[in-house]
Curated annotation (Swiss-Prot):
GO terms for molecular function: ATP binding; GTP binding. Keywords: ATP-binding, GTP-binding, Nucleotide-binding. InterPro entries: P-loop_NTPase, RapZ-like, RapZ-like_N, RapZ_C. The lineage of its organism: Bacteria, Pseudomonadati, Pseudomonadota, Gammaproteobacteria, Lysobacterales. Displays ATPase and GTPase activities. This is Nucleotide-binding protein Xfasm12_0753. Belongs to the RapZ-like family. GTP binds at residues 65-68. It comes from Xylella fastidiosa (strain M12). ATP binds at residues 13-20. It comes from the Bacteria.
Length: 290
């Protein structure tokens, strides 16, 4: 039997560029994640991890950056030997302009990892750029996050990197609030504002469509059952047609007033249904919860 191929995403880049947000996004999509791993421990870490489930494919994301104190130049050398472990390794480098990084540090009041060297913040950023330049040069993708907010960065990671780009149709089920606008990239948009709203139940108001109490409430509503049944039938028919038409990526968006209860519930339910139907590349994104 041919051993399974494993996917490894290596996240590196400048401090303050959004690496932690990216790693958390991969974790939310069921990647096994580890942050601040020294390069020299990477082979040992992967050998142990792959032995845990050696008969199944593994999706792993790790963060390696200036905090590890390792010789970062060894990372690219190791990446090219990963195929011997039957691992497809991808290096992503997160970057941002100096002005953006300075503003983010001012907003968060966090210390730069190199500040212990007695450097000013601009000097620390400049030194980090110099030390990580070989990784930036070797990366398969450089993601400049200067113009991204948190929501845009998470969505970019999901659509561009977290879902496998292959001959399979990748599905993203998204929730949103109409008051903040319809996602322009959505292929299908469904309006859930006609459905009963858990917001008006005081005990449910602080919860979201991910919570069991909200799910229980929604599943007791006849209109919700009818709505889900009809949309499920529609998508079961047309998603298969879209894959046959060589589409590689489809976004299905559900909207409600606040983007917290109904739309989240529907996106989660449709994602679960899609996985049960055999779609392997499925993700959810809840714009107003991020």
């Amino acid at each position: 039997m041919k051993p399974p191929e494993h996917s490894l995403i290596i996240i590196s880049g400048l401090s303050g560029s959004g690496k932690s947000i990216a790693l958390k996004t991969f974790e939310d999509l069921d990647y096994y994640c580890s942050d601040n791993l020294p390069v020299e421990l990477l082979p040992h870490f992967l050998r142990r991890r792959l032995r845990v489930a050696e008969l199944s494919d593994q999706r792993i994301a790790i963060g390696i950056d200036i905090r590890s104190g390792s010789n970062l130049s060894e990372l690219d050398q190791w990446r090219h030997t990963a195929k011997h472990y039957n691992i497809k390794a991808h290096l992503l480098f997160f970057d941002a302009s100096n002005e953006t990084l300075l503003k983010r540090y001012a907003d968060t009041r966090r210390r730069h990892p190199l500040s212990h060297l007695g450097l000013s913040l601009p000097e620390a950023i400049a030194l980090e750029r110099e030390l990580t330049a070989p990784l930036r040069e070797a990366a398969e993708a450089v993601i400049d996050t200067s113009t991204f907010n948190v929501h845009q960065l998470r969505r970019h990671v999901v659509t561009e990197f977290a879902l496998t780009h292959s001959d399979k149709l990748s599905l993203l089920f998204e929730s949103f609030a109409y008051k903040r606008g319809i996602p322009t990239e959505a292929d299908f948009v469904f309006d859930a504002r006609i459905l009963p709203n858990p917001h008006w139940k005081p005990e449910l108001r602080s919860l979201t469509g991910r919570d069991s109490n909200v799910r229980d409430y929604m599943e007791q509503q006849p209109d919700v059952i009818l709505y889900l049944t009809q949309i499920t039938e529609f998508l079961d028919t047309w998603l298969a047609r879209l894959q046959a038409d060589t589409r590689s990526y489809v976004t299905v968006a559900f909207g409600c007033t606040g983007g917290k209860h109904r739309s989240v519930y529907l996106a989660e339910q449709m994602a679960r249904h899609a996985r049960e139907k055999g779609w392997s590349e499925v993700a959810t994104f809840h714009r107003e919860l991020e």
